[in-house]
């Protein structure tokens, strides 16, 4: 809602199922954001969504090693994550993505900054894929044969 109030146009695709889906749906409706959010549920192949995104946002209070963040990295998505243990281990702030506090103001400010800076998003996307390939060179065979 903060982004919409600032005039930032964004469409959110939410993939996956979870116990908070109904809570999220109610929040979307309460804030009048029905046209801005698309809740797709579980999808067989999430990669086309990663490929089309301008920014992958992973805002969570707690996280271990996130497979979704790894997928976004290998597919070259610019990434914004919230500041928690697992996320900090996967994304180096200002190097291969951006890390911010998990507050509406901080997340919305970072999203706005990144959406306005295409060059920075491209840098983060390239670096995130490179970083993952350096860490796990064998992963390349899973995506490119």
Regions found by a protein language model. Give the residues of each.
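Nucleotide-activated donor-binding/catalytic signature segment of Leloir-type glycosyltransferases, i.e.
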Residues: 25-41
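Aromatic "clamp/platform" in nucleotide-sugar-dependent glycosyltransferases that forms part
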Residues: 42, 61
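Short alpha-helical segment that forms part of, or immediately flanks, the ligand-binding pocket
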Residues: 47, 66-74, 88-89
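Short hydrophobic beta-strand element within catalytic cores of glycosyltransferases
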Residues: 78-81
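Conserved acidic donor-binding segment of nucleotide-sugar-dependent glycosyltransferases
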Residues: 93-94, 98-104, 113-118
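A short, well-ordered alpha-helix in the C-terminal region of glycosyltransferases
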Residues: 113, 120-134
């Amino acid at each position: 809602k903060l982004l919409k109030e600032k005039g930032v146009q964004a469409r959110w695709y939410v993939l996956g199922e979870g116990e908070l889906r109904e809570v999220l749906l109610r929040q979307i409706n309460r804030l009048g954001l029905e046209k801005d959010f698309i809740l797709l549920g579980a999808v067989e192949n999430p990669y086309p969504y990663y490929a089309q995104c301008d920014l992958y946002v992973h805002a969570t209070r707690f996280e271990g090693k996130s497979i979704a963040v790894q997928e976004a990295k290998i597919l070259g998505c610019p990434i914004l994550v919230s500041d928690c243990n697992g996320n900090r281990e996967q994304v180096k702030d200002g190097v291969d993505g951006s890390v911010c506090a998990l507050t509406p103001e901080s997340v919305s400010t970072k999203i706005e900054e990144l959406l306005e800076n295409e060059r920075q998003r491209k840098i983060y996307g390239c670096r995130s894929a490179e970083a993952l390939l350096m860490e796990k060179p064998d992963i390349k065979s899973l995506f490119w044969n």
